[in-house]
Amino acid sequence: MIIGSLKLKNPIFSAPMAGISDLPYRLIMKRHGAALVFSEMISANGLFFNGKATRDLLNSRTEERPLAVQLFGDEPGRLADAVKQVEGCGELIDLNLG
């Protein structure tokens, strides 16, 4: 499966889930065959206000790559800023606008 320039070995993804998709969970999913894992939902507002708990959600390891980072928010300017902040944190950025 190919998403943009990202080539994945299979179509198995681990969905972004608040309170679930932390680093240990993602590592387990990778060990069990997930080609792509997602971060927990990360608040654009939390990044804007530089919240430690929000920043901690961005912790990752090489062995879980490729990693998708999911951002959520409802203010376009803050979402744009959040995208810039997490650009190097994963191979894919997913925007949750709902």
Predicted feature locations:
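Short, flexible active-site-proximal loops enriched in glycine and acidic residues
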Residues: 91-98
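Glycine-rich, positively charged N-terminal anion/phosphate-binding segment
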Residues: 1-2, 17-91
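Extreme N-terminal starter segment of soluble prokaryotic enzymes
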Residues: 1-2, 6-12
